Amino acid sequence: MRVLFDQATPVPIREFLIGHTVRTAAQEQWDTLANGDLLTAAEHAGFEVFLTTDKNIRHQQNMAGRTIAVVVIGLQQWPALRPHVALVVDAVNAATPGSFTEVDIPVV
């Protein structure tokens, strides 16, 4: 699948998304777009999954009719997220068009 990372998504996650094509919003030169415009641009560019740390995206955006799957992780700090990266990988692998998944990362 084609996966787009939002601004604060820890980039090292990409190394664990084997078999997926991963790009960042900055790489696509979309780092100035607001979430609604970013999701639309991602859909038009053929991205299938949007990985973000923005827990409020579901309440800020109308997700109805979206074809891109959204996966939300609650942590931006890679050292804290690293032991739980398998949860993120599983969520991305299970994503289906238009789905919304919040990954529950245990905070120690």
Task: Show the residue positions of the predicted features.
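C-terminal structural segments of small proteins and small subunits
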Residues: I68-V108
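N-terminal first-folded block
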Residues: M1-E48
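Short glycine-/acidic-enriched loop or helix-start segments at secondary-structure transitions
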Residues: R14-E15, Q60-N62, R82
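Amphipathic, hydrophobic secondary-structure cores in small proteins
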Residues: Q29-W30, L39-A45, V49-Q76
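Internal alpha/beta domain cores that form substrate/cofactor-binding pockets in large enzymes
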Residues: M1-R2, T21, A25-Q29, Q61-V72, ...
